[in-house]
Amino acid sequence: MIQTESMLDVADNSGAKRVQCIKVLGGSHRRYAAIGDIIKVTVKEAIPRGRVKKGQVLNAVVVRTRKGVRRSDGSVIRFDVNSAVLLNASGQPIGTRIFGPVTRELRTEQFMKIVSLAPEVL
C-alpha cells in the first residue's frame, strides 16, 4: 500500500536511489497504490552522473511492496521493502537493468519489458 509521501527504493539502474510518491494515478480520489500501479514520484536521492537528477518528477510503476499481493490460490507474496521502477513519458523503463525479483502481476502488455529484464519472476 503506497500512498502520498511514501518513500520507495528504486529497483533499476536509472541513477535514482530513493523516490517519494507525490500522487497515486488512476482516479481523482485514489488513495493507495499496489503492485503494478503507476504513481508520480520525485527523486530524493540520486547517484552522480546518473540518468535522472535529484528533484526530477517522473512516473514509476510499483514492483515490490511490504503489503504484498494476494493470489487467487490464497497465497500472499510480500517483500521487505517498497520498490519502484522509473518510467519515461512513453511508459518505458528508464533503466536498462532491474534489480531483485518482481511478481507475475506485472506480466501485462504494458510492463513486459520490466518482466523480461528482471532476474527473477515470482
Curated annotation (Swiss-Prot):
<dbReference type="InterPro" id="IPR036853">
    <property type="entry name" value="Ribosomal_uL14_sf"/>
</dbReference>
<comment type="subunit">
    <text>Part of the 50S ribosomal subunit. Forms a cluster with proteins L3 and L19. In the 70S ribosome, L14 and L19 interact and together make contacts with the 16S rRNA in bridges B5 and B8.</text>
</comment>
<dbReference type="GO" id="GO:0070180">
    <property type="term" value="F:large ribosomal subunit rRNA binding"/>
</dbReference>
<dbReference type="GO" id="GO:0006412">
    <property type="term" value="P:translation"/>
</dbReference>
<dbReference type="InterPro" id="IPR019972">
    <property type="entry name" value="Ribosomal_uL14_CS"/>
</dbReference>
<dbReference type="InterPro" id="IPR005745">
    <property type="entry name" value="Ribosomal_uL14_bac-type"/>
</dbReference>
<dbReference type="GO" id="GO:0003735">
    <property type="term" value="F:structural constituent of ribosome"/>
</dbReference>
<keyword id="KW-0689">Ribosomal protein</keyword>
<keyword id="KW-0694">RNA-binding</keyword>
<dbReference type="InterPro" id="IPR000218">
    <property type="entry name" value="Ribosomal_uL14"/>
</dbReference>
<keyword id="KW-0687">Ribonucleoprotein</keyword>
<dbReference type="GO" id="GO:0022625">
    <property type="term" value="C:cytosolic large ribosomal subunit"/>
</dbReference>
<comment type="similarity">
    <text>Belongs to the universal ribosomal protein uL14 family.</text>
</comment>
<dbReference type="Pfam" id="PF00238">
    <property type="entry name" value="Ribosomal_L14"/>
</dbReference>
<protein>
    <recommendedName>
        <fullName>Large ribosomal subunit protein uL14</fullName>
    </recommendedName>
</protein>
<comment type="function">
    <text>Binds to 23S rRNA. Forms part of two intersubunit bridges in the 70S ribosome.</text>
</comment>
<keyword id="KW-0699">rRNA-binding</keyword>
